[in-house]
Amino acid sequence: QLFPWSRYLTGTCGTAPSDSFDPLAYWVEQAHARNLRLEAWVNPYRICAGANAQSDFDALPDSSPAKQHPDWVVSCDGGYYFNPGIAEVRQLICDGVSEIVSKYAVDGIQFDDYFYPSTQFDDAATYQASGSNLPLADWRRDNVNQLVQAVNTAVHQNAMQAGCRFGISPSGIWRNRGANAFTGSATHGFEHYSSSYADSVTWIKNGWIDYICPQIYWQIGDTAADFQTLANWWSHQVRGTDVQLVLGLAAYKIGDSQYGDVWANDGCGEIGRQLDLAAGIQDIDGCALFSYQNLRGNDTLFQTVQERWK
């Protein structure tokens, strides 16, 4: 009721599939018939992005919240995003999540790693109007924190499926250890705390999520972001909490030379070593592969995983 039908279903945004076919209801039914969980993946703020962002935005029907409330929308880096600093935007996202979990027997909601798309996000007017005494970066993180806390409440209050969970899959580095972040990981890479304004450690410590799935998409021994270093660091963040830790693994890198010799020549072996390493670290509850299309059709990878998960 809140958002138009996706163009990926029929080719036209806002057009429903024929014969009242509901793909999500079908997927849930078929997954549960096979003893599989199905969680709905949500990218909370992004409206349109990529090379066709402008034409995709123009093609949105008038019923789209982005068209009904243009003052909620910010153009950034060639894409269009809902402004996280607007309370009505946070409510819209919560309502959208509530609609999913109350009408479908999904087993969870998972947010992807996209929050603020850039440090250059044009929200100066919203920041000024808020009257906040927080510095801009902290204000942005607080906006995301408010959304995470509210969505957690919405999931657990409105879910029709028993045991429905709320999890987030952020990029693999919270903060790099340094002069201003003594508690960060011993890494050198993109950090979501300062670049996306996503304070995942605060979510964990406050119990606002049921699980966290950091995308540790580097190899064991990587000089900038070693897989083992990050696996151990994240395990310490969830220790003593009720938040489960699932490590995201980069199956998409297998066989691709742009990611280096290890991934190009022994990618399946690398995934196997990462699975073995994770299994031996306290407080790691499992691993997730990104993505299924990389598992399907790769018999070696399938066997690598099956041997460990049978």
Model-based region annotation:
Residues 1-43, 126-159, 226-231:
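Aromatic-lined substrate-binding rim segments of carbohydrate-active enzymes
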Residues 2-6, 44-48, 115-117, 172-176, ...:
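Solvent-exposed loop/turn segments at secondary-structure junctions
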Residues 5-17, 46-77, 114-132, 177-190, ...:
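Aromatic- and acidic-residue-enriched segments that line the glycan-binding/catalytic groove
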Residues 6-21, 75-94, 132-145, 188, ...:
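The substrate-binding groove and active-site-proximal loops of carbohydrate-active enzymes
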Residues 24, 28-29, 39-103, 194-198:
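Active-site-adjacent "subsite" loops/lids of carbohydrate-active enzymes
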Residues 31, 93, 100, 109-112, ...:
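Conserved, mostly hydrophobic/aromatic
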Residues 37-49, 110-114, 138-193, 242-254:
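Aromatic-lined carbohydrate-recognition surfaces of secreted/lumenal glycan-active proteins
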Residues 197-223, 234-310:
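Substrate-binding cleft of secreted/luminal carbohydrate-active enzymes
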